[in-house]
Amino acid sequence: MAVLTKIETPLGTVIASSDGQSLTGLWFEGQKYECAFVEDAVWDDSLPLWKNVKQALEDYFQGVDDVASAVPIAFVGGTPFQKAVWAVLTEIPSQTVWTYKDVAERVGEKLGRKTSSRAVGTAIGRNPISLFVPCHRVVATTGALTGYAGGVERKRALLILEGHSVVKDRVMKGERHET
């Protein structure tokens, strides 16, 4: 059974899901695929994990570099391929962007076979644990801010928060925006 709660952030309300031990989902309210893979859920704000999730989110929005390791995560849904893609996303260092091609190459190395950027993009779009599995750090080869289930406006805001220079919905490579 999944346990759910709502948490306010500077970019809107998020819905968090847990199996009681780990964070299994984090979606901006109303985003595409909200609460995907959640079945038999109960709302409970008293789960001890929520304190750590809330603190990690506060730290993140105050500019702390890497908060993802502060909270255990688990992928409870998805295909083996999707889980492989999501696991690779956790390897993207803070203040860094990778392209869909970069992610596809890394997933291909792990799976021992070629993987297309398009297939990777589809899996990234279904990422159930926003922010902690940083899919917002993946951009097109041109630097364009393509796709984000929480909305491109949020993707832009998250990348700027992390210090990237974003002009006309494109990350400017090699340029950092000082916050």
Model-predicted regions and their roles:
Residues 123-125, 132:
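Major-groove DNA-recognition helix of helix-turn-helix-type DNA-binding domains
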Residues 150-166:
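A short, Lys/Arg-enriched interface patch at domain edges and termini
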Residues 108-122:
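Short, positively charged loop/turn segments that connect secondary-structure elements
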Residues 81-85, 116, 154:
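N-terminal positioning helix adjacent to the helix-turn-helix/winged-helix DNA-binding module
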Residues 1-111, 161-179:
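Basic nucleic-acid-binding alpha-helical/helix-turn surface characteristic of O6-alkylguanine DNA
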Residues 130-149:
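Charged low-complexity interaction tracts in eukaryotic proteins
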